[in-house]
Amino acid sequence: MIQPQTYLNVADNSGARELMCIRIIGASNRRYAYIGDIIVAVIKKAVPNTPFERSEVIRAVIVRTCKELKRSNGIIIKYDDNAAVVIDKEGNPKGTRIFCAIARELRQLNFTKIVSLAPEVL
């Protein structure tokens, strides 16, 4: 469950290292975001000499949450941290690699480019 002011790790090689959620895209009064939701975030930590700088506002899609994800067949997926992948306005990832296994639900939400870059799909 990601809400505004939540810190997230970045799961790709775009150059950002840590994000802070400032808004959840999709509804005017949504309180929480889950896996597959798009958020507006600000960069809190970045790698030097990359296109991103601190305090830059970006969009990201959530790929890992500490809150468990329950599927209809009874499987529960739970990660150790909260993480997101930086995307552009069209929904394509800015990085060229993704460092974690991601949930199958992202394929159903039309993030096929992120799914194809991931090393494993759970």
From Swiss-Prot:
Pfam family, one: Ribosomal_L14
Location(s), subcellular: Plastid, Chloroplast
Regions that span the bilayer: none
Presence of keyword Endoplasmic reticulum: no
Assigned keywords, A-Z: Chloroplast, Plastid, Ribonucleoprotein, Ribosomal protein, RNA-binding, rRNA-binding
One GO cellular component, as annotated: cytosolic large ribosomal subunit
GO biological process: translation
CDD domains associated with the record: Ribosomal_uL14
Gene Ontology molecular function: large ribosomal subunit rRNA binding; structural constituent of ribosome
Top-level taxon: Eukaryota
PANTHER family: 50S/60S RIBOSOMAL PROTEIN L14/L23, LARGE RIBOSOMAL SUBUNIT PROTEIN UL14C
Complexes and interactors: Part of the 50S ribosomal subunit.
Protein family: Belongs to the universal ribosomal protein uL14 family.
Function: Binds to 23S rRNA.
Protein name, UniProt field: Large ribosomal subunit protein uL14c
